[in-house]
């Protein structure tokens, strides 16, 4: 796997997490990542880190937390041009739906609700159409025990089946809150097998998918905010001078 470049796009630093950006970067480099996304929740906004180090990429990630779809749309407009990766913290049916229906959202993370996995065929189809990746956060497996771990595995199997059926981008992430939550790419790929992800799928979810996310031309000069975009009139509209 040496020829692959691996990226973890959801690593929380202070104030969300317990470690500084510098400490997390150092550990991630040691574990073999080519780059990471430094994240905070929108409710715990800290300084957005984006300075890379030689041979290592650092991306600005925000995990939006909203109480309703209307507030989520407002947060998307606020943060889209400020970050490299825009994730939505799900867990509510309305928020999950609003996230996957919005092409300005990159990732839906923690979609499971008290009633179930939080995803269905309709939402998976919308995620595919709008190129919104579904995150499989490995901390749900390594940081939980008993019934909670069983539920996480069950939800991940549901996400996997829906993602395969509707060609939804799949993303693997540690969702680490400290250096102790980080895992090497090889370990994450191995853990993904617990819920049925094939090795080639896991490699893509940790390499090609995150790279495609950060390479999106989200900061287009014509993008103003959610629901507002500038269009240049064509010559036929302007008419002949």
From Swiss-Prot:
UniProt keyword Transmembrane present: no
Keyword list (alphabetical) reads: Cytoplasm, Endonuclease, Hydrolase, Nuclease, tRNA processing
Q: List the disulfide bonds.
A: none
Which Enzyme Commission number(s) are on file for it?
3.1.26.5
Among the GO biological process terms of this entry, one is: tRNA 5'-leader removal
SUPFAM superfamilies recorded: PHP domain-like
Database matches in PANTHER family: RIBONUCLEASE P PROTEIN SUBUNIT P30, RIBONUCLEASE P SUBUNIT P30
Q: What does this protein do?
A: Part of ribonuclease P, a protein complex that generates mature tRNA molecules by cleaving their 5'-ends.
Q: What is this protein called?
A: Ribonuclease P protein component 3
Q: Which organism is it from?
A: Methanococcoides burtonii (strain DSM 6242 / NBRC 107633 / OCM 468 / ACE-M)
- Give the encoding gene's name: rnp3
């Amino acid at each position: 796997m040496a020829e692959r470049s691996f990226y973890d796009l959801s690593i929380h630093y202070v104030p969300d997490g317990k470690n500084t950006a510098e400490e997390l970067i150092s550990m991630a480099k040691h574990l073999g990542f080519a780059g990471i996304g430094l994240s905070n929740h929108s409710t715990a906004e800290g300084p957005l880190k984006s300075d890379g180090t030689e041979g290592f990429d650092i991306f600005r990630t925000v995990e939006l937390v909203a109480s309703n779809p209307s507030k989520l749309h407002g947060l998307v407009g606020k943060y889209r041009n400020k970050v490299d990766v825009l994730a939505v913290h799900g867990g509510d049916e309305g928020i999950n739906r609003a996230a996957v229906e919005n092409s300005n959202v990159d990732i839906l993370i923690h979609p499971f609700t008290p009633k179930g996995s939080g995803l269905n065929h309709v939402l998976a189809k919308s995620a595919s159409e709008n190129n919104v990746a579904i995150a499989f956060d490995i901390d749900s497996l390594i940081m939980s025990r008993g019934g909670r771990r069983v539920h996480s595995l069950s939800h991940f199997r549901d996400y996997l089946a829906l993602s395969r059926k509707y060609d939804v981008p799949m993303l693997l992430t540690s969702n680490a809150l400290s250096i102790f939550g980080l895992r090497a790419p090889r370990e994450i790929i191995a853990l993904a097998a617990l819920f049925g992800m094939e090795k080639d799928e896991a490699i893509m979810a940790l390499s090609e998918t995150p790279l495609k996310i950060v390479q999106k031309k989200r900061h287009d000069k014509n993008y103003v905010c959610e629901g507002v975009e500038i269009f240049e009139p064509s010559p036929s509209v302007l008419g002949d001078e």
